[in-house]
Amino acid sequence: MLFWVLGLLILCGFLWTRKGKLKIEDITDKYIFITGCDSGFGNLAARTFDKKGFHVIAACLTESGSTALKAETSERLRTVLLDVTDPENVKRTAQWVKNQVGEKGLWGLINNAGVPGVLAPTDWLTLEDYREPIEVNLFGLISVTLNMLPLVKKAQGRVINVSSVGGRLAIVGGGYTPSKYAVEGFNDSLRRDMKAFGVHVSCIEPGLFKTNLADPVKVIEKKLAIWEQLSPDIKQQYGEGYIEKSLDKLKGNKSYVNMDLSPVVECMDHALTSLFPKTHYAAGKDAKIFWIPLSHMPAALQDFLLLKQKAELANPKAV
């Protein structure tokens, strides 16, 4: 009996693996739209999918980002300047994309644009500190999706939302984590709403990667700027050396940071080209081995492990 059970499990594993490797036949007639292509995941994705033969429409925030990307890609790739927080800009871009793709529609929408905002303890922050990452990471993503969705439905294509392990675990204070938690919720409701239309919706949850988004120097600079504005009471609670201790903790976590961005793009590739795309992708060894498993653990264990990564306060009772 045990032999048959093991045999059945092995067969199921083989068929599941085989299923994941089945690909769409032709990509050379398919259009994809990617946001946040100035640098990082979006830039690498645009270059990678251009080489594969997709008709890539890459949205950049800056003219310099657009120019640099066009210099590294084929004439087939198109760029457009896009601020995802500007509703009129998004509407104009969607109309322009509609004219580009014609009756083929849009096979892939990759919502990648994002910002970290201020990553600092909650009691250091104001409502405005929360606003920027939520405007870009959540409302910007929703705005682009709503405007591009008719084109994706026409092609019975794919929507790929780049979230984060920060959408599964509250690793840091600030607006980044709430924005990514909300992206996860939007992604799941969209996936169920689009199923009847033959549109597949996937969510990618990268771990810690070395990108402009996670530049520790910029993180510390923003913390220092906020520190200067804090009340004497809060400064006393945290202590003058708190930021330096936080920096030491960041340096100690370098081993967790993925230097190679390609795992995220590989997830995008599978979500775009597989006949059976996954609903969720964990990108990076740290995401697969630590962050995602931890997100399923009891809150007490999460708190214990995550609090060990935080710098100690000088005098938390000074309130």
From Swiss-Prot:
GO biological process, one term: progesterone metabolic process
Catalytic EC class: oxidoreductase
UniProt keyword annotations, A-Z: Endoplasmic reticulum, Lipid metabolism, Membrane, Microsome, NAD, NADP, Oxidoreductase, Signal, Steroid metabolism
Keyword Signal listed: yes
Binding locations of substrate: S164
Residues making up the signal peptide according to the UniProt record: 1-17
This enzyme's EC code(s): 1.1.1.209, 1.1.1.53, 1.1.1.105
Binding residues for NAD(+): 34-58, 83, 180
Gene3D superfamilies linked to this entry: NAD(P)-binding Rossmann-like Domain (3.40.50.720)
Active-site residues (renumbered): Y176 (proton acceptor)
Primary location recorded for the protein, binned into one broad class: membrane
Gene Ontology, cellular component aspect: endoplasmic reticulum membrane; intracellular membrane-bounded organelle
Subcellular location: Microsome membrane; Endoplasmic reticulum membrane
Expressing tissues: Highly expressed in trachea and epidermis. Detected at lower levels in spinal cord, bone marrow, brain, tongue, esophagus, heart, colon, testis, placenta, lung, skeletal muscle and lymph node.
Catalytic activity: 3beta-hydroxy-5alpha-pregnane-20-one + NAD(+) = 5alpha-pregnane-3,20-dione + NADH + H(+); 17beta-hydroxy-5alpha-androstan-3-one + NAD(+) = 5alpha-androstan-3,17-dione + NADH + H(+); androsterone + NAD(+) = 5alpha-androstan-3,17-dione + NADH + H(+); 5alpha-androstane-3alpha,17beta-diol + NAD(+) = 17beta-hydroxy-5alpha-androstan-3-one + NADH + H(+)
GO-annotated molecular function: alcohol dehydrogenase (NAD+) activity; all-trans-retinol dehydrogenase (NAD+) activity; androstan-3-alpha,17-beta-diol dehydrogenase (NAD+) activity; androsterone dehydrogenase [NAD(P)+] activity; oxidoreductase activity; racemase and epimerase activity; testosterone dehydrogenase (NAD+) activity
Family, per entry: Belongs to the short-chain dehydrogenases/reductases (SDR) family.
Assembly and binders: Homotetramer.
Protein name as annotated: Dehydrogenase/reductase SDR family member 9
Organism whose genome encodes this protein: Homo sapiens (Human)
Gene that specifies this protein: DHRS9
